[in-house]
């Protein structure tokens, strides 16, 4: 694999630094989604711990925010794997590299925002549902919509990772512009 990277055709469309931008997309995808998931888990776990002191029987129902926060990291992992497949190809254009960078940032930052929303709403929701059980459904709805933020970024990242040209040879349409 290292030999194929060293033997890449270096042209104006495929400079030697193209993999750097793709690698930054991979890094952004996994790092930001894991940060979001970790924040969501930690923040909502504080609420679960305090609820466990008041009402120990409510702990099992209270783990929903932790599950939702854990799923965010999976989105980043899937995008990370797809982008890695693109970066390790023998021809890797600058166009493809920037698309991969955008895909990684999209998935990662949406995952970070989603994790923060899940953590805050999960913490408050768990505490509120322990005092008033009718709030549990409202908490779940807030968590679902918070998770949807990460899902939107995941879908856009998949579209970006699967589209775009990855050719190091100028075509007739690109050379006439």
Curated annotation (Swiss-Prot):
Site (Essential for proton translocation) location in chain: 147
Keyword Cell membrane: no
Cellular component GO terms, alphabetical: contractile vacuolar membrane; membrane; proton-transporting V-type ATPase, V0 domain; vacuolar proton-transporting V-type ATPase complex
Superkingdom assignment: Eukaryota
Pfam family, one: ATP-synt_C
Membrane topology, Cytoplasmic segments: 41-64, 122-139
Transmembrane feature ranges: 20-40, 65-85, 101-121, 140-160
Compartments in which it is found: Vacuole membrane
Keyword annotations from UniProtKB, A to Z: Hydrogen ion transport, Ion transport, Membrane, Transmembrane, Transmembrane helix, Transport, Vacuole
GO molecular function: proton-transporting ATPase activity, rotational mechanism
Gene Ontology process terms (BP): asexual reproduction; calcium ion transport
Chain ranges on the Lumenal side, renumbered to this chain: 1-19, 86-100, 161-177
Topology class, membrane: Multi-pass membrane protein
Record's function text: Proton-conducting pore forming subunit of the V0 complex of vacuolar(H+)-ATPase (V-ATPase), a multisubunit enzyme composed of a peripheral complex (V1) that hydrolyzes ATP and a membrane integral complex (V0) that translocates protons. V-ATPase is responsible for acidifying and maintaining the pH of intracellular compartments.
Assembly information from the UniProt record: V-ATPase is a heteromultimeric enzyme made up of two complexes: the ATP-hydrolytic V1 complex and the proton translocation V0 complex. The V1 complex consists of three catalytic AB heterodimers that form a heterohexamer, three peripheral stalks each consisting of EG heterodimers, one central rotor including subunits D and F, and the regulatory subunits C and H. The proton translocation complex V0 consists of the proton transport subunit a, a ring of proteolipid subunits c9c'', rotary subunit d, subunits e and f.
PANTHER family xrefs: V-TYPE PROTON ATPASE PROTEOLIPID SUBUNIT
Record-stated family: Belongs to the V-ATPase proteolipid subunit family.
Protein name per Swiss-Prot or TrEMBL: V-type proton ATPase 16 kDa proteolipid subunit c
Organism: Entamoeba histolytica (strain ATCC 30459 / HM-1:IMSS / ABRM)
């Amino acid at each position: 694999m290292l030999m194929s990277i060293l033997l890449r055709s270096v042209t104006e469309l495929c400079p030697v630094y193209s993999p750097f931008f793709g690698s930054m997309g991979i890094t952004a995808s996994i790092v930001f989604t894991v940060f979001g998931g970790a924040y969501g888990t930690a923040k909502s776990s504080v609420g679960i711990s305090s609820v466990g002191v008041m009402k120990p029987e409510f702990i099992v129902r209270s783990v929903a925010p932790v599950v939702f926060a854990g799923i965010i990291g999976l989105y980043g992992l899937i995008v990370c794997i797809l982008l890695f497949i693109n970066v390790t190809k023998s021809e890797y254009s600058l166009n493809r590299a920037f698309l991969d960078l955008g895909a990684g940032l999209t998935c990662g930052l949406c995952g970070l925002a989603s994790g923060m929303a899940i953590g805050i709403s999960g913490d408050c929701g768990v505490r509120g549902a322990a005092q008033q059980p009718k709030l549990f459904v409202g908490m779940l709805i807030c968590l679902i919509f918070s998770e949807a933020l990460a899902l939107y970024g995941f879908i856009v990242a998949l579209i970006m990772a699967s589209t775009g040209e990855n050719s190091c040879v100028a075509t007739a349409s690109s050379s006439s512009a």
